[in-house]
């Protein structure tokens, strides 16, 4: 799904780094997968993949399963990790993350 945007080796390394429950840190993950240095267009493409229901927002249930977008066998985020991730990205307080909020969080 991320071919041409992200390198498989970077994704594998990023997933390995947050295998343990409670170890997911979105900023570190975005850096490790190589997303931080990507263009706005590439970040928007990644957002489109993560936005499973195509609502133009990433909601809490989609964040919980965030890692599984990168590998089907990846773990779900814990409730605490999901809440922290949502709070970090939801700058307008509407309970979901839009594409601009996502881009700002990635560039963080």
Curated annotation (Swiss-Prot):
Q: Mind telling me which Pfam families this protein's record contains?
A: EF-hand_7
Which positions bear N-acetylalanine? 1
A GO MF annotation of the entry reads: calcium ion binding
**Residues annotated for Ca(2+) 1 binding in this entry:** 51, 53, 55, 57, 59, 62
- Which parts of the sequence belong to the EF-hand domain? 38-73, 77-108
Function per UniProt: In muscle, parvalbumin is thought to be involved in relaxation after contraction. It binds two calcium ions.
Which family would the database say this protein is a member of?
Belongs to the parvalbumin family.
Question: What is the additional note?
Answer: This is the major hake parvalbumin. This parvalbumin has an isoelectric point of 4.36.
What protein name is recorded for this chain? Parvalbumin beta
The organism encoding this protein is: Merluccius merluccius
